A protein has these predicted regions:
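Secondary-structure boundary elements
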Residues: 1-56
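Active-site neighborhood of thiol-dependent amide/isopeptide-bond enzymes
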Residues: 43-103, 107
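A generic structural micro-environment signature
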Residues: 15, 44-46, 59-60, 129-134, ...
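Functionally constrained cores in energy, signaling, and assembly domains
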Residues: 1, 16-20, 68, 110-116
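A general marker of short, structured functional hotspots
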Residues: 27-29, 64, 96, 117
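His-Asp-centered catalytic microenvironments across diverse enzyme cores
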Residues: 4, 86-153
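Residue-level signal for well-ordered alpha-helical scaffold segments within enzymatic catalytic domains
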Residues: 32-36, 70, 74, 110, ...
Length: 153
């Protein structure tokens, strides 16, 4: 799944010049790319290769996490994944009624940790692109305080 040697993934890394940047700028650039350039949406399956997520141009927690990890590993940033089951009610409103109705009661949710400056950091806020998050906040009329936005130094 983490097919970071895929030519399209390698071309993206070269185009963005991530390997030329220091580790922090590399991490930040990859994070922002996955968050904002890969839109929020449901792929055909959770078990698809990172290159397929890149080709689709969209993903959700599990598939965006796959792409995020592939890009990190290709750029020599250690990472790992965690996951657990959540009740589908937590995703109500984030998926169409048809998808929600047909989804299993328990859904697998994952997030990625990166190793930076001798510590592991949990990074999960890349799931919703900024445009989708803004619309969701507006439509649900909820405070922005409820959503963590990664503050880069």
């Amino acid at each position: 799944m983490l097919d970071f040697l895929n030519p399209n993934i390698q071309k993206l890394i070269e185009k963005r010049r991530w390997k030329e940047q220091n580790k922090f700028e590399r991490l930040k650039g990859i994070y922002k790319f996955v968050r904002d350039d890969i839109l929020f949406g449901y792929n055909v399956d959770d078990n698809i290769a990172a290159s397929k997520v890149l080709e689709d141009g969209y993903g959700q927690c599990n598939t965006k996490g796959t792409l995020f990890m592939a890009l990190l590993r290709a750029c020599e940033i250690p990472c790992r994944i965690h996951g657990f089951m959540i009740n589908k009610q937590l995703q109500k409103g984030a998926m169409s009624r048809f998808v929600y109705k047909n989804a299993p009661q328990k859904i697998f949710h994952s997030w990625v940790e990166v190793y930076f400056e001798d510590k592991w950091y949990e990074l999960e806020a890349f799931i919703l692109d900024r445009k989708y998050l803004s619309k969701l906040q507006k439509n649900l009329q909820i405070a922005t305080d409820f959503f963590v936005v990664m503050a880069w130094r």
